[in-house]
Structure formats: structure tokens, C-alpha cells
């Protein structure tokens, strides 16, 4: 299955974990810290939301989008960590087309989202978002296209005997 933010939140919607996971995804860092203080435990900022995600996914596997998945499952031997990127101009064109916005709005959207992702990843993992050493595969969607990226990922999974 695909586990993106929306799917993970739907899974925990009716549970006590919803507020914590929602805060994690919306970058409200204070909740985990307050939880740790209230519980008088030595809990790091990522223990609570990462524990929830690990509980949801268990040992079944799947695709985890965003959510620091490359860090979260780094100790599992069958984890494949993939980072897809593209040239900024290609990203701008894609955002303009997808959201129906101007070039200036698309540039601002990309800058805002990239900054959020960078800060989010740094806060929860102490790693730099997008650095190649955090991933096994770094694929340039602008060069390969979506279909080319999918083919490379599938070929890689076959080489690793994961499919």
C-alpha cells in the first residue's frame, strides 16, 4: 500500500493517535515535546509520531511518502530509500500546470514547500533533506520522466530480489 500523509491520518482518524500524527504532519513540533514532559519520559521529538507510523505499517511494508520514511525505516534490511527530484524550471512548469497558477506563484510555492521539507526533515532526523547519502536511489524525474523513474525503481527492486 501507499502511505502518504492523508492515508496515515485516515487510518488513525478515530484513535488517540490522530492529534499527535496530525500535529507531526502539520509541523506543530510542540505536541511531542509536551507529551514527553507530561509522561516524564526521555522521549525525543520523533519517538511519538515515528512510533505511530511504525505501528500502522508494522511488518507489512509499503511505500511511505514524505514523513521522513527514509530515516524511519533505515534499520530494516528490505527498506529502499528513494529521492526523486527535478530541475527547478521543470518543477515550476509542473506546479503551474497542476495547480493552474502563475510562474511567480509556482516559484513561491516551491520555495515555501522546499523550506518546510528541509526544516521538517532536519528537526525530526537531524539530517539534511535531499542529500544523496540518505537514499539508495536519487532519480531526476526531469530527465527520466515518471515512467523512466518507475522503470528504474522496478529494475532496482528486482535486482534486490524484493519483487
PLM feature spans:
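ATP-dependent small-molecule kinase phosphotransfer cores
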Residues: 3-61
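Small-molecule kinase domains that catalyze NTP-dependent phosphoryl transfer to phosphate-bearing small molecules
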Residues: 21-32, 40-43, 103-147
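Short, amphipathic alpha-helical "lid/cap" segments that border enzyme active or binding sites
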Residues: 50, 146-154
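RNA pseudouridine synthases
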Residues: 56, 68-75
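Conserved nucleotide-binding/hydrolysis micro-motifs of P-loop NTPases
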Residues: 69-70, 86-91, 143-145
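Conserved phosphate-donor/acceptor-positioning beta-strand/loop module used by diverse small-molecule
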Residues: 75-99, 103-113
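C-terminal helical "lid" subdomain and adjoining coupling/linker elements of P-loop NTPases
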Residues: 160-163
Amino acid at each position: 500500500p501507499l502511505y502518504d500523509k492523508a492515508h496515515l491520518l485516515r487510518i488513525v482518524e478515530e484513535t488517540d493517535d490522530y492529534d499527535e500524527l496530525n500535529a507531526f504532519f502539520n509541523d506543530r513540533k510542540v505536541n511531542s515535546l509536551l507529551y514527553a514532559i507530561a509522561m516524564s519520559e526521555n522521549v525525543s521529538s520523533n519517538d511519538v509520531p515515528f512510533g505511530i507510523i511504525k505501528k500502522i505499517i508494522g511488518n507489512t511494508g509499503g511505500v511511505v511518502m514524505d514523513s521522513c520514511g527514509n530515516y524511519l525505516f533505515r534499520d530494516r534490511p528490505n527498506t529502499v530509500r528513494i529521492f526523486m527530484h527535478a530541475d527547478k524550471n521543470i518543477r515550476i512548469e509542473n506546479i503551474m500546470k497542476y495547480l493552474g497558477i502563475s510562474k511567480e506563484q509556482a516559484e513561491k510555492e516551491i520555495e515555501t514547500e522546499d523550506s518546510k521539507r528541509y526544516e521538517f526533515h532536519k528537526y525530526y532526523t537531524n539530517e539534511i533533506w535531499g542529500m544523496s547519502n540518505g537514499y539508495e536511489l536519487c532519480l531526476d524525474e526531469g530527465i527520466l520522466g515518471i515512467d523512466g523513474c518507475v522503470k528504474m525503481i522496478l529494475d532496482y527492486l528486482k535486482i534486490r530480489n524484493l519483487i
